[in-house]
Amino acid sequence: MQLIKCLVIIQLSLLLVEESFAGRDFYKILNVKKNANTNEVKKAYRRLAKELHPDKNKDDPDASTKFQDLGAAYEVLSNPDKRKTYDRCGEECLKKEGMMDHGGDPFSSFFGDFGFHFGGDGQQQDAPRGADIVMDLYVSLEELYSGNFVEIVRNKPVTKPASGTRKCNCRQEMVTRNLGPGRFQMIQQTVCDECPNVKLVNEERTLEIEVEQGMVDGQETRFVAEGEPHIDGEPGDLIVRVQQMPHPRFLRKNDDLYTNVTISLQDALVGFSMEIKHLDGHLVPVTREKVTWPGARIRKKGEGMPNFENNNLTGNLYITFDVEFPKKDLTEEDKEALKKILDQSSINRIYNGL
């Protein structure tokens, strides 16, 4: 009897836990693990937003619902406070505590107000268009190696209704003027329509710029309609151009990395073991058991940069060695001992090495 009572209590407890976690599984919606960091959450949302956008899935009657679920999942899992509450007791707790406000628009933060095109006709070619804005984004080599999200806040001019009307859609038309009996003149004049008046107002906008693994210096990301506005047409685009900052230890050439290591003369002669700290913190072991001459270069396969088109492919790391000679003078006894060890005659070869 006591055993049955315990089982009933356990069953009721499980039901209460299940009830407290009622609601959507945001981790499943975003397809991320429960220990996923913020950048992994952002990356998952950005990828899935392209796949699940209703404009790309017009034949799916549930497309809008799926897209809304995706946005809700991102809003919760990208916010530390909301995520902590969600992990504790699910979506119902968020609703009870008023934390599901649905006020955000993550899609526009990642892709701009006008999103992106899915291969359609896009904007009309003849429509007037505002100027593009080019913005340089300075990033570290570490960010280009591992990937990152950079949040930028900018004042974007947007059109708002204003009182009165204005001339719009102005164009040149041919008009016939009567100059008298049997005399006419064709002239060209500007003809405009009357449109509701508008004004430009600066609004603060936040954009999430993804620095993707393997991006190269000068590579551009385009945000449609985030550029200069045009009162009679469409806004231009915002073009974010990656500018790679110099790195103190590594030089990048395409997908390969180059670095220099200075070793002692002793290590150059007898060999050595060391580790090089890579861009993401992992250690690259380097071992030499033979003589290393000044300017010697070795290759570490697969320790370069990830390829932008295919992150499964990586370049190589090339290590060039410099040898530091001792500063102190040797005694005559040391010199003689060294000559015996090296057993090498003088080589005074003169040549043009340039």
Curated annotation (Swiss-Prot):
PANTHER family, sorted: DNAJ HOMOLOG SUBFAMILY B MEMBER 11
Tissue: In the testes, detected at low levels in somatic hub cells, cyst stem cells and the apical tip (at protein level). Levels in the testes decrease with age (at protein level). Expressed at low levels in hub cells, cyst stem cells and germline stem cells, and at high levels in spermatocytes and cyst cells.
Spans traversing the lipid bilayer: none
Gene Ontology molecular function: any one: unfolded protein binding
Entry keyword Membrane: yes
Function, in words: Maintains stem cell niche architecture in the testes. Activates an extracellular integrin beta-PS pathway which regulates DE-cadherin (shg) levels in somatic hub cells, and is essential for maintaining the number of germline stem cells and the structure and localization of hub cells.
Reported consequences of knocking out the gene: Males are sterile and display an age-dependent decrease in testes size resulting from a gradual loss in somatic hub cell structure and a decrease in the number of germline stem cells. Hub cells frequently do not localize to the apical tip and are instead present throughout the testes. The number of hub cells is not affected. Reduced DE-cadherin levels in the hub cells. Absence of integrin clustering and decreased focal adhesion kinase (FAK) phosphorylation at the hub/cyst stem cell interface.
Outcome after substituting residue 253 to L: Loss of activity. Decrease in focal adhesion kinase (FAK) phosphorylation and loss of cell spreading
Protein name per its UniProtKB record: DnaJ homolog shv
Domain J: 25-90
SUPFAM superfamilies, per database record: Chaperone J-domain (SSF46565), HSP40/DnaJ peptide-binding domain (SSF49493)
Alphabetical list of PROSITE patterns matching this protein: DNAJ_1 (PS00636), DNAJ_2 (PS50076)
GO cellular component, one term: extracellular space
Phylogenetic lineage: Eukaryota, Metazoa, Ecdysozoa, Arthropoda, Hexapoda
Principal location class: nucleus
Cellular location(s): Nucleus; Cell membrane; Secreted
GO BP term, pick one: positive regulation of integrin-mediated signaling pathway
Glycosylation sites: 260, 312
Signal peptide: 1-22
Extra facts: The name 'shriveled' derives from the shrinking testes phenotype of mutants.
Alphabetized UniProt keyword annotations: Cell adhesion, Cell membrane, Glycoprotein, Membrane, Nucleus, Secreted, Signal
